[in-house]
From Swiss-Prot:
Its EC number(s): 2.7.7.27
NCBIfam families named among the record's database cross-references: glgC, PRK00725.1, PRK00844.1
Main enzyme class: transferase
Residues annotated for alpha-D-glucose 1-phosphate binding in this entry: Y107, G173, E188, K189, S206
Gene coding for it: glgC
Pathway(s) this gene product operates in, as recorded in its UniProt entry: Glycan biosynthesis; glycogen biosynthesis
Name assigned to this protein: Glucose-1-phosphate adenylyltransferase
Pfam (any one): NTP_transferase
Keywords annotated in UniProt: ATP-binding, Carbohydrate metabolism, Glycogen biosynthesis, Glycogen metabolism, Nucleotide-binding, Nucleotidyltransferase, Transferase
Intrachain S-S bonds: none
Organism: Shewanella sp. (strain W3-18-1)
Length: 420
């Protein structure tokens, strides 16, 4: 669809609802005190910034963020970083916490989270409603799926991408389509996904991003709310119940720009979170955070620049192949192939390699850290060794992932918890 005016009309007629209430239990202690969408990513961002930036860059300027699990840091971040939109100009980013609007229950599932906000959506008078997952890192121009939805005459459109069968098993909804991308079958998180017809090692997976005609969405949500056996979930209940009698289409995920590789990461495990951050260190990463054509917006703290001090023979403050964010001080220490978030301090004679270090961490002298995720606010005692011997890491109370990434949190170090 090349008609810019047509696309701009579609985005103006759309209300986006970002589902950001999930914990992300496969991240273990990393989400003990924050929802997965509030988790840090890429040196200065949080995961929620990516779907929000996609909305703004796509021209979708009316957005609701649905929150539930341990949402304080998420709400605070959205208020600080996304509260500048003008309602009188048709722009808004609103926070929609679970508040028992229609029953005594909190949000029971993805469909129920939308159903409990029907009155808020109706007040916006949108022609289309986008329901978006708030816990993935990706770049997507939502104008494309909106145009495809309108052109096909669909009641619902599901954004999808090809995923290896081994990766999809038990993790993603799996779609079957005909030659016109009409959905013929949908199974939520099967243990044995059906392969794509042209590639037996891949399957077509739902991204958890949907476009609905507004009235059609309301009808299906009301019907589902009256079904006592429903799990109140789009993947488990809504989609399987409508594909036979209604027009439900799949939309292949693509980059916002021609001839560029599409980027999407689940970051739902410690290993995938670590790996996705490490990928950013490439000279030409698949996700280019420096691409001004598709900026990622976030809350910007007023912090001084990063500083590297000491140039002695036995201690030299330096960072190589790394992302080092504002407020960091590398004091006579060495950082290699690592992502350091705001206000991290690495003290003399310490070495940090192949690690993701979240904000406000202090690494004291003579520490050696590699292949690790260090959670926010940790103070690593002098002489601590992390990531070199997994048995020793476990004996200290740290968690070691399936692929050998060591997670360290404040609780594991005996420090007060409740940080976010």
């Amino acid at each position: 669809m090349s008609n810019v005016r047509y696309i701009s009309n579609l985005t103006r007629e759309t209300y986006a609802l970002i589902l950001a209430g999930g914990r992300g239990s496969r991240l273990h202690e990393l989400t003990d005190w924050r929802a997965k969408p509030a988790l840090y990513f890429g040196g200065k961002f949080r995961i929620i910034d990516f779907p929000l930036s996609n909305c703004i860059n796509s021209g979708v300027r009316r957005v609701g963020v649905v929150t539930q699990y341990k949402s304080h840091s998420l709400i605070r971040h959205v208020m600080r970083g996304w509260g500048h939109f003008k309602k009188e100009l048709g722009e808004s980013v609103e926070i929609l916490p679970a508040s028992q609007r229609f029953s005594e229950n909190w949000y029971q599932g993805t469909a129920d989270a939308v159903f409990q906000n029907i009155d808020i959506i109706r007040h916006e008078l949108p022609k289309y409603v986008m329901v978006l997952s708030g816990d993935h890192v990706y770049r997507m121009d939502y104008a494309g799926i909106l145009a495809a939805h309108a052109e096909s005459g669909a009641d619902m459109t599901v954004s999808c991408l090809e995923v290896p069968i081994a990766e999809a098993a038990g993790a993603f909804g799996v779609i079957e389509v005909d030659d016109n991308m009409r959905i013929l079958g949908f199974e939520e998180k099967p243990q044995r996904p059906k392969p794509s017809p042209d590639n037996p090692e891949m399957c077509l997976a739902s991204m958890g991003n949907y476009v609905f005609n507004t009235e059609f969405l309301f009808e299906q949500l009301k019907k589902d709310s009256q079904n006592a056996t429903s799990d109140r979930d789009f993947g488990k209940d809504i989609i399987p119940s409508i594909i036979e009698k209604h027009n439900v289409f799949a939309y292949p995920f693509k980059s916002p720009f021609p001839n560029e590789q599409a980027y999407w990461r689940d970051v739902g495990t410690l290993d995938s979170f670590w790996q996705a951050n490490m990928e950013l260190l490439s000279p030409t990463p698949a996700l280019n955070l420096y691409d001004a054509k598709w900026p990622i917006w976030t809350f910007q703290e007023q912090l001084p620049p990063a500083k590297f001090v000491f140039d002695d023979d036995d201690r030299r403050g330096m960072a190589l192949d790394s992302i080092v964010s504002s407020g960091c001080i590398i004091s006579g220490a060495t950082v290699r192939r690592s992502v350091l978030f705001n206000e991290v301090r690495v003290c003399s004679y310490s070495v940090v390699e192949d690690s993701v270090v979240l904000p406000d961490v202090v690494v004291l002298r003579h520490c050696k850290i590699k292949n690790a995720i260090i959670d926010r606010g940790c103070i690593i005692p002098e002489g601590t060794v992390i990531g070199y011997n997994h048995d020793h890491d476990r004996a200290k109370g740290f968690r070691v992932s399936e692929k050998g990434v060591t997670l360290v949190t404040r609780d594991m170090l005996g420090l007060p918890v409740g940080y976010e």
